[in-house]
């Protein structure tokens, strides 16, 4: 799948779940399950509840996503 096929939304981390997954509430009100991107894991960027993040999602499954940026 090409990079252009992804959708990006800002959101807020609501809850930390097992296996490095998070419950994220998007700005449009939807709640999704997201995991951190590999570069964030590699660089040991911590994501905690209440953090503002950018979530990347595929148009095929709008209930799961990948956190690719944590806003400062």
Swiss-Prot record:
Component of the 30S ribosomal translation pre-initiation complex which assembles on the 30S ribosome in the order IF-2 and IF-3, IF-1 and N-formylmethionyl-tRNA(fMet); mRNA recruitment can occur at any time during PIC assembly. It is found in: Cytoplasm. It comes from the Bacteria. This is Translation initiation factor IF-1. It comes from Ruegeria sp. (strain TM1040). NCBIfam families: infA. GO terms for molecular function: ribosome binding; rRNA binding; translation initiation factor activity. Belongs to the IF-1 family. One of the essential components for the initiation of protein synthesis. Stabilizes the binding of IF-2 and IF-3 on the 30S subunit to which N-formylmethionyl-tRNA(fMet) subsequently binds. Helps modulate mRNA selection, yielding the 30S pre-initiation complex (PIC). Upon addition of the 50S ribosomal subunit IF-1, IF-2 and IF-3 are released leaving the mature 70S translation initiation complex. Pfam families: eIF-1a. Keywords: Cytoplasm, Initiation factor, Plasmid, Protein biosynthesis, RNA-binding, rRNA-binding. Residues 1-72 form the S1-like domain. GO terms for cellular component: cytosol. CDD domains: S1_IF1.
């Amino acid at each position: 799948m090409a990079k252009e096929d992804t959708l990006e939304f800002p959101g807020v981390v609501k809850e930390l779940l097992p296996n490095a997954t998070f419950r994220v509430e998007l700005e449009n009100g939807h709640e999704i399950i997201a995991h951190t991107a590999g570069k964030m894991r590699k660089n040991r960027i911590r994501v905690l509840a209440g953090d503002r993040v950018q979530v990347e999602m595929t148009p095929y499954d709008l209930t799961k996503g990948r956190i690719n940026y944590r806003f400062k």
